[in-house]
Amino acid sequence: MAVPFFCCTFAAMQTPIYIIEEEKLRRNLALIREVAERTQSEWILAFKAFALWKTFPIFREYINSTTASSLSEARLAKEEFGAKAHTYSPAYKDEEFDDIVRCSSHLTFNSLSQYERFHERAGECSLGLRVNPEYSEVETLLYNPCAPGTRFGVTADKLPEQLPKDIKGFHCHCHCESGADVFERSLQHIEEKFSKWFGQLEWINFGGGHLVTRKDYDIELLVRLMQGFHERWPHLKVIFEPGSAFAWQTGPLVASVVDIVEDKGIRTAILDVSFTCHMPDCLEMPYYPEVRGAKHIEDNNHTPKLIPHTSNLYRLGGNSCLSGDFMGYWQFDHELQVGEEVVFEDMIHYTTVKTNTFNGITHPAIGMLKSDGKLEILRQFGYEDYRNRMD
């Protein structure tokens, strides 16, 4: 279904709805393709950040492969993207492994014990090991794959001098929405820890978290780093598997004000979306999303003193029963009204892949703003989606 779209208002649409904008998506894809060419490396889409399969025909114009971390993602790669996945999982299950193999071109093991258990059943897959460089600049422990006690990867001191003959690659993921300067430092640690095994390998996967589509990303530095790496290790194929970079700033989540309540001088605009259900990273990271037409006011011990003296200041509250399903504060340039739209920017990556139906709250629709200015509804959700999960 396609309906006319007007850039200044969403009033004609039913909210809530995620809207991915085709022109912005193609802009990111074109840039990533250029980076892949200039760095002589393969860039593939990580489904953990973005998996809206009705957009895959667009992706196939720019990239050839994807990365999966489960049987469902591997099947999505083969059945909907049309190419076998580069698959990594923290732990493969016996009853799923053969199906994963059928859907994968590359298969990375998280541990030597998983390798020993499954490698003989891996068929024609190119096999790899995830390694842990014991270095990451990700400050939020929830997202730091190299934090002490991590369950991810094999450290250098636990690798044998001679790798098993069927291990063809290393997988190393230690970034999260990082710049090229961070990768420069990480690469130094990776080579210091693991380069003595590089002669035994055919490929290396530097994982995700490389936010090349962010405006301040230093692409020229990345190109220089890869030129140097290829000079040192000309036989190694290099793979990057970002997720956020593909969908970065490609569209909003549009919500509406359902009610406005006040307690102890704090006004909360209750919306028809939920932070915990539809924007979980906001609470998990946490981070404050950009709201169109509003200024975020830092929430600290002094904020309550500012409330009586700041006009049009609101908390934004979700429509679930979770007490903490709110974030604040935002100052608007006018007084909010019931029925008014509230637009959360950059809500396409790590949202639709992580949403849930807590409280039975209706999932936002998913739409695509096409290049011709029409809005196509890709998916709408209802009671049946909630009921079928509860079978």
Where are these regions (language model features)?
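Acidic, glycine-rich loop-and-beta core segments that form the ion-binding/anion-interacting portion
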Residues: 191-245, 249
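Short, positively charged and aromatic/hydrophobic N-terminal segments
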Residues: 8-9
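Charged (often Lys/Glu-rich) extended helix/loop segments that serve as interaction or gating elements
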Residues: 242-391
